[in-house]
Amino acid sequence: MHMNIDHARVRRESLRWIIILALNNARPVGAYEGVILSIAQSEYPDATPLELRRELDYLAGRELVKLDKEPGGRWHAALTRTGTDVAEYTVDCEPGIARPAKYW
């Protein structure tokens, strides 16, 4: 049996999980996009600022992340209460985020 893997989708969903984990570790202060990007680039060295912003916007749209788009151009992100619950496995995670299955 041949499986077609959508690599772009896997990458997007994995980046979203990486962002959530990074912001969970940055609580309660949150983090600027540059810090989050450097963390994302440890898994995806070719990750771009635009790609990161697209996924931050997605997570903000799902009300998992609060974004502060500063007038100077920098973005600051922090987890919402729901985002923290997703990171801590206390709520179900809807499709679109590559959260690993809970094993404990």
Question: Residue spans of the language-model regions?
Answer:
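A short, conserved structural fragment
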Residues: A60-E70
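Short, amphipathic alpha-helical interaction segments positioned at domain boundaries
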Residues: R81-W104
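Short alpha-helical segments that sit at the start of domains
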Residues: M1-G30
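Short amphipathic alpha-helical interaction segments
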Residues: D46-G61
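Alpha-helix C-capping/helix-to-loop hinge sites
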Residues: A22-A26, S42-E43, K66
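Accessory beta->alpha helical hairpin/"wing" motif in late/C-terminal subdomains of nucleic-acid enzymes
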Residues: E70-V86
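Short acidic, hydrophobic short linear motifs in intrinsically disordered regions
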Residues: V29-A40
